[in-house]
Amino acid sequence: MDPFVVLVLCLSFVLLFSLWRQSSGRRKLPPGPTPLPIIGNILQIDVKDICKSFSNFSKVYGPVFTVYFGMNPVVVLHGYETVKEALIDNAEEFSGRGILPISERITNGLGIISSNGKRWKETRRFSLTTLRNFGMGKRSIEDRVQEEARCLVEELRKTKASPCDPTFILGCAPCNVICSVVFQKRFDYKDENFLTLIKRFTVNFRILTSPWIQVCNNFPLLIDCFPGTHNKLLKNVALTKSYIREKVKEHQATLDVNNPRDFIDCFLIKMEQEKDNQQSEFTIENLVGTVADLFVAGTETTSTTLRYGLLLLLKHPEVTAKVQEEIDHVIGRHRSPCMQDRSHMPYTDAVIHEIQRYIDLVPTGVPHAVTTDIKFRNYLIPKGTIIITLLTSVLHDDKEFPNPKIFDPGHFLDENGNFKKSDYFMPFSAGKRICAGEGLARMELFLFLTTILQNFNLKSVADLKNLNTTSATRGIISLPPSYQICFIPV
């Protein structure tokens, strides 16, 4: 048979199979825009602003709708009530992790973030318990964050009140906290290995926000067959994991099971305890994946929030002044802030919550997946279907937060100036898959920001009227625009 005829027949078969698969699946799933064969809804989605496309779809198809990434259906949940019903009311059924092609290549299903089933449950439980009880009478996590806050202040003093881009310095602080917990020690901000680690995290974070990654997730074939920034991403991940493996080997050579020094030691001891269990999830590769996840979850997300937060405080000097007034009243100038102070600082607490709400760091959340066939809002969602919870629709709900596009700490204050909680505050997601590093992130944001404002006044290089606070990207992560700032010692 003529090769051309064979090619045409093969392509026709693929096209017909795609049409059959999509049409048969769509009968059960929530409604949504009509997908094209093979490529799905990619042409109807603005990969530079996915959230805007999804919000527009919700106006047409309702709060539960389906889009296709290539040939794969993805169910999107819009609005607080829908997200709550899924992640909280049906927590177990929606507790799976939706694995997109890029994340699958990065993690191989290991660690905390992208694992599922028994591996996820055991690794997450162990990690949370270890971090919560870390030190067993030695230095607490709070001690480590306070130490890093003091080191951060000293680094900021070295700028001598000159204009600077705070990206690098603010990236060092949360990364060093993770290093302290995982590797036993913090690094000097000039250490070459530390600088390399920071650079890789920063580059990878920016690549992950790019439209190209969204295209790769729609067409996985591109990952192996085409050049692009995804190759730089995967190379950086491989180099980082290689560095972690070296650290693990160093720990193995000096391990004292009666005196664990850090997270790696605790994991190695757990491995030894389960060495006779052939089904154990505590392996070297899972340790490497888990440590990598701790850096991913605990470094760039926190540093980006800090960087965006300082930009907002620059833009709103009246807010900054009130926070500093509260710092003077509750803490003073002669001791370091501690977590006990937070309950006595309602305005500062409200400001930090508003920063997280306003910047909407992960607008689409990290993908979930249903762990079983489930009937949800009269639709049948098959086991394994990827679920996207549109967190931006919760954090920017105009009924809960009047004028949601405006930065206003009053969103979290009652009429008496007391801190006011909101069920709509979901920057860390919700349910069983809520961010494992939530407690650490909240601690770092409070201690780093209060320590900075205790020691410095903030000065903008640009005129405040021209200071842009609109996110530079609106993909899976919101990044602030670049800016210059002066840290003026008080």
Swiss-Prot record:
It is found in: Endoplasmic reticulum membrane; Microsome membrane. Its cofactor is heme. It is a peripheral membrane protein. GO terms for cellular component: endoplasmic reticulum membrane. Signal peptide: none annotated. GO terms for biological process: organic acid metabolic process; xenobiotic metabolic process. This is Cytochrome P450 2C20. Its main location: endoplasmic reticulum. It catalyses: an organic molecule + reduced [NADPH--hemoprotein reductase] + O2 = an alcohol + oxidized [NADPH--hemoprotein reductase] + H2O + H(+). Cytochromes P450 are a group of heme-thiolate monooxygenases. In liver microsomes, this enzyme is involved in an NADPH-dependent electron transport pathway. It oxidizes a variety of structurally unrelated compounds, including steroids, fatty acids, and xenobiotics. Belongs to the cytochrome P450 family. One of its GO terms (molecular function) is iron ion binding. Induction: By 3-methylcholanthrene (3MC). Pfam families: p450 (PF00067). Its EC number is 1.14.14.1. It comes from Macaca fascicularis (Crab-eating macaque). Heme binds at residue 435. It is an enzyme of class 1 (oxidoreductase). Keywords: Endoplasmic reticulum, Heme, Iron, Membrane, Metal-binding, Microsome, Monooxygenase, Oxidoreductase. It comes from the Eukaryota.
